[in-house]
Regions:
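Extended hydrophobic leader/signal-anchor segments used for secretion and membrane insertion
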Residues: 2-160
Length: 160
């Protein structure tokens, strides 16, 4: 009941889609901080073919020591959340940084710190079929290019 009332009051303050995404991101972050797993419907093609638009993903909270290259993680941007594959972990000035990349993206994402990481994708549902996240690392550069070409083609075909 509390959650429903809270969402109702939040929805009254939302004027734009951007506001809605920020509120949902904040709510997801709060739930993950409390140890709750999230079931979210994916949108976009940045993780194609591992995660496709309409797939359901399960995001669970993750401890820093459990973050491994190849894992698919969710991290917080200013107004939304990004779900990409962790490709590099490095330390600078006694602080750990994590770099992700979408499976069909041309470039790496900006470095993020652990406090920006919301959780790790534990499962992907394609329809009713449960898929485990592909923890292959490193992904060859040619695979990124191939995935990008497929994504461009799918975007082009959606216009027809």
């Amino acid at each position: 009941m509390y959650l429903t009332a809270h969402l109702y009051h939040l929805s009254k303050r939302m004027n734009t889609e951007e506001d809605q995404r920020k509120v949902l991101r904040d709510l997801a972050d709060e739930l993950l901080d409390k140890g709750t797993s999230l079931r979210i419907t994916a949108s976009g093609y940045s993780m194609y073919p591992a995660i496709r638009p309409g797939n359901t993903i399960i995001i669970k909270p993750v401890e820093e020591e459990d973050l491994k290259c190849g894992s698919i993680i969710a991290w917080k941007r200013e107004k939304d959340m990004v779900v990409h594959r962790l490709v590099l972990v490095y330390e600078s000035d006694n602080k750990k940084y994590y770099i992700t990349r979408g499976d069909s993206c041309r470039s790496l994402d900006r470095p993020v710190t652990h406090d920006m990481i919301a959780g790790r994708v534990e499962a992907i549902y394609k329809g009713h079929r449960l898929m485990q996240p592909n923890l292959v690392h490193p992904i060859p550069e040619r695979r990124y290019r191939a995935n990008r070409m497929k994504t461009i083609f799918l975007g082009y075909m959606r216009k027809f």
